[in-house]
Amino acid sequence: VPHISFSELKKWDFCPFYHKLVYKDKIKGFEGNTHTAFGKAVHKVCESIIINEVKEPKAVFHEEFVKEISYLKEDCVDWNLVDQMKTQGSELVELVLPAVKEEFPNWSEVISVEEQLFESIDEFSTKPYDFKGYIDLVIKTDDGKYHVIDWKTCSWGWDSRRKADPMNVYQLTLYKKYWAKKHSVCAEDVETYFALLKRTAKTNKVEFVRVSNGKKRTQNATDLLMKALYNINAGVKIKKRTSCNRCEFRRTEHCP
């Protein structure tokens, strides 16, 4: 069964032609840099902390960061930034578990870590399609609520515009919808959060941003998903000109 992830949906929304280059033509675009290596390393620590409450998160971070950097092409690595990130990451990962416990004092159970979603998209009738995703963390509190959490590494945080940007919040909207479907849980018992892990912030380095997902937002996210699937299956691949100045393929042989 074919599938679509939120990452793919986001690329399609950015530009259908860009989506075609990446997913149909298999043209490699952005393959990572120092920032993505940092993010992957911090994510790995968060996973280890929640499962095992590791005593030395700094050591786990350092090992994972060095490994992720080694996967990058030499010209993609900013070595001065790497040195800064080693210090910043070591400080940041020590704060994650205390922050989770403070935000959710009645946390009673870890439901899953890095949980895979592969749920059928029932609204799309043209052909079978699954929604694919990986949920960083789901915990349950003693009031019976489930809390879906997505770790996001960043520099100093998000402004109010980014916190409300549909193409950010729809990720959690769809995760909530399909996680609840997978587990036959009432959607009203599921709450969602971005956990911002701030590399350069002086205070509030771990911030939980609650994302509300009412019926209207859920419908809007589902409508966007349906629109993308319809156009992808119909072979529609128009260029979204408003995205050209932010596109890595602009003025290349792939998109002259």
Q: How does the language model describe each region?
A:
Residues D25, K152-S155, L196-K198:
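A short beta-strand motif that forms part of the nucleic acid-binding face
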Residues A41-K44, Y170-Y178:
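Short amphipathic alpha-helical face segments that pack within enzyme cores
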Residues I4, E94, K177-P256:
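Metal-dependent nuclease catalytic regions and adjoining charged, substrate-binding loops involved
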Residues G29, W156-S160, T203-V206:
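Short small-residue beta-strand/loop micro-motif enriched in glycine and branched aliphatics
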Residues G29-A37, A164, V236-T242:
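Structural motif
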Residues S112-L172, A180, A221-L224:
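Non-catalytic protein-protein interaction segments used by genome-maintenance enzymes to assemble
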Residues K44-I121:
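A non-catalytic, helix-rich entry segment at domain boundaries
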Residues L9-V54, K86-S90, E94, E114-E115, ...:
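Nuclease catalytic cores
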